[in-house]
Design a protein with these regions (language model features):
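Extended amphipathic coiled-coil helices
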Residues: 2-179
Length: 182
């Protein structure tokens, strides 16, 4: 009975309370990568840089508008809003890997656009600080020294820690909504 109640509460939370949540593709499209984000990636590496970037952008959204919610950190159960539906992620985190790939693409575009525009000598002056930094950003954007699958596993865990749904919070929100409606 308790499992059914928890499942019901989770489904109610996702499908009713979070019915206006942003779709994951819209969330990714809304991310504006800054030069500071790129420098953070170079300084702190792929896992920390990407975690910071995603969490920074998730923080800008109300909890009920976020496109990601984790229901069980130990089992890495994540729900992703896609095409106005909540879908549970698979065991291989295929959808999260696609998200990471899209963010890597955005980092590359920002590196080749904003960074090169601000520091046009970064490709030609091999002795400049910006040339070195450009190389570090490009290296870290694709996972750095850690194998990309291992790096993504750490990245996903960091994101899941941030979007974990506390069962007490779900119950509180649901009861608040029911109280308001009555």
């Amino acid at each position: 009975q308790n499992t059914k109640t928890n499942t019901f509460n989770l489904n109610f939370f996702l499908n009713e309370t979070c019915k206006d949540a942003m779709n994951i593709d819209d969330f990714i499209d809304s991310i504006q990568i800054t030069i500071d984000d790129l420098k953070n990636l170079a300084k702190n590496g792929y896992v920390e840089g990407m975690s910071y970037l995603l969490i920074k952008n998730l923080k800008q959204l109300d909890v009920t508008k976020r496109p990601l919610h984790c229901s069980d950190l130990k089992r890495e159960s994540i729900y992703i809003r896609d095409k106005n539906l909540w879908n549970k992620g698979d065991d291989k985190n295929t959808r999260l890997a696609k998200i990471a790939t899209n963010i890597t693409r955005l980092n590359t575009i920002a590196l080749q656009g904003e960074y090169q525009n601000r520091y046009p000598h970064c490709l030609t002056d091999t002795k400049s600080k910006e040339h070195d930094e450009y190389g570090k950003i490009a290296y870290e954007a694709f996972g750095g020294k850690i194998h990309i699958d291992k790096a993504n596993k750490k990245l996903f865990h960091n994101i899941m820690k941030y979007v974990i749904i506390d069962r007490n919070t779900i119950v509180y929100i649901i009861h608040s909504l029911l109280y308001i409606q009555s």
